[in-house]
Amino acid sequence: MNKAFTREVDRDDEDDEADLESPVLPSGAKNYITAGGYRRLRDELKALLDDERPKIVETVSWAAKNGDRSENGDYLYGKKRLREIDRRIRFLTKRLDLAEVVDSTVHHGNDQVFFGATVRFASDQGEERTIRILGVDEAESARGEVSWVAPIARALLKARVGDEVKLVTPRGVETIEVLEVRYPPPGGEADVVRA
């Protein structure tokens, strides 16, 4: 068969789905991020560019020399992994270019909720929770971190200790009371940065 009518498999439908799983930033919103979050994204980008991508390129190059690419698992997996890495590199580059680093330590001692705050609050049922309000690219809900665009964060922003705010949930409107607001001390944001 003529080579013009065959094509090497270079894309998977699964690859496009990965972009849909990325944190969504509302249109026109700034990409706020803490210094620690910015460092983590920058370090990940550097590791991909300096370490992981060159290793995969070397593997793909070696595998390509081994003949029939259509049944060459090392080649096919390597190409797929290379696409994933390149997509992540593009994503990180865009996010870092748009990032606006916010120093939350300037609010240390303040009782008002701003970006970077750790907030302890109680629901109208008396349940207490503590969350930290971070950027969309750094928040991990399993660690009690929420994005500043999340409904709970939007409800709490600018509230002060003792304030009651309304939170719209699927179960209806809840009233939550701000019990405590904390920020990292000046020069101490590195202490709360995950490794």
Predicted ranges, named:
Residues 20, 28, 96-97, 128, ...:
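Residue-level signal for pocket-adjacent positions within structured domains
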Residues 45, 49-52, 96-100, 160, ...:
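Conserved NTP-handling cores and scaffolds of large molecular machines
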